[in-house]
């Protein structure tokens, strides 16, 4: 009986490992991006902390911005904007629910290659209860912190597509330089030989 249980458990592990299954909230970061520089205008801000945490969870080694290595990709965090629109109202016209939208822009600089812009957008709804002002503020802070975490996850999930775009641009560049045949010399048909 114990042998059968061990066999079934081993089989389950092999099946999940063989089909490409991976843990939730982890991304297959390309090997060329396993060492990165995180560049941010606010290195201790909530977005920088969330992105740094996501990079570490995905096995990326972060180097200091002032490092002397220039062969390492750099993730540069840009502007963050949070907008709040009314989603629903009470009968008296007061706002009952807000739709919050966080937009984050960033770019990945691959040395000797190109700069690839990426962005993330996170939507959340927030109920505004006028009877509980303090609880409302605490809930809004928690929602904004969660939005930073989701935006960081989205940015990290876009790293494999940047690597694919970089490979595609390399292929296009080599095909345009080697595949274009030389144009033949012009031959005049009006002049006699």
From Swiss-Prot:
A lipid is attached at residue 19 (N-palmitoyl cysteine). It comes from the Bacteria. It is found in: Cell outer membrane. GO terms for molecular function: lipopolysaccharide binding. Residues 1-18 form the signal peptide. It is a lipid-anchor. One of its GO terms (biological process) is Gram-negative-bacterium-type cell outer membrane assembly. HAMAP family: LPS_assembly_LptE. Belongs to the LptE lipoprotein family. Together with LptD, is involved in the assembly of lipopolysaccharide (LPS) at the surface of the outer membrane. Required for the proper assembly of LptD. Binds LPS and may serve as the LPS recognition site at the outer membrane. This is LPS-assembly lipoprotein LptE. It comes from Escherichia coli (strain ATCC 8739 / DSM 1576 / NBRC 3972 / NCIMB 8545 / WDCM 00012 / Crooks). The lineage of its organism: Bacteria, Pseudomonadati, Pseudomonadota, Gammaproteobacteria, Enterobacterales.
């Amino acid at each position: 009986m114990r042998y059968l249980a061990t066999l079934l458990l081993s089989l389950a592990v092999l099946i999940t490992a063989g089909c490409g299954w991976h843990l939730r909230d982890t991304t297959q970061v390309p090997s060329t991006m396993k060492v990165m520089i995180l560049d941010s205008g606010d290195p201790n801000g909530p977005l920088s902390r969330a992105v740094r945490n996501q990079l570490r969870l995905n096995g990326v080694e972060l180097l200091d911005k002032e490092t002397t290595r220039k062969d390492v990709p750099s993730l540069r965090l840009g502007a963050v904007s949070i907008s709040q629109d009314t989603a629903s109202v009470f009968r008296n016209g007061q706002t009952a629910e807000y739709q919050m939208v966080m937009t984050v822009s960033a770019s990945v600089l691959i040395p000797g290659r190109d700069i690839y812009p990426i962005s993330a957008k996170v939507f959340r709804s927030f109920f505004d209860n006028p009877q509980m002002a303090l609880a409302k503020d605490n809930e809004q802070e928690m929602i904004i912190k969660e939005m930073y975490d989701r935006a960081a996850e989205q940015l990290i999930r876009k790293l494999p597509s940047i690597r694919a775009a970089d490979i595609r641009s390399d292929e296009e560049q080599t095909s345009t330089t080697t595949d274009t045949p030389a144009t033949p010399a012009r031959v005049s048909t009006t002049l006699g030989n």
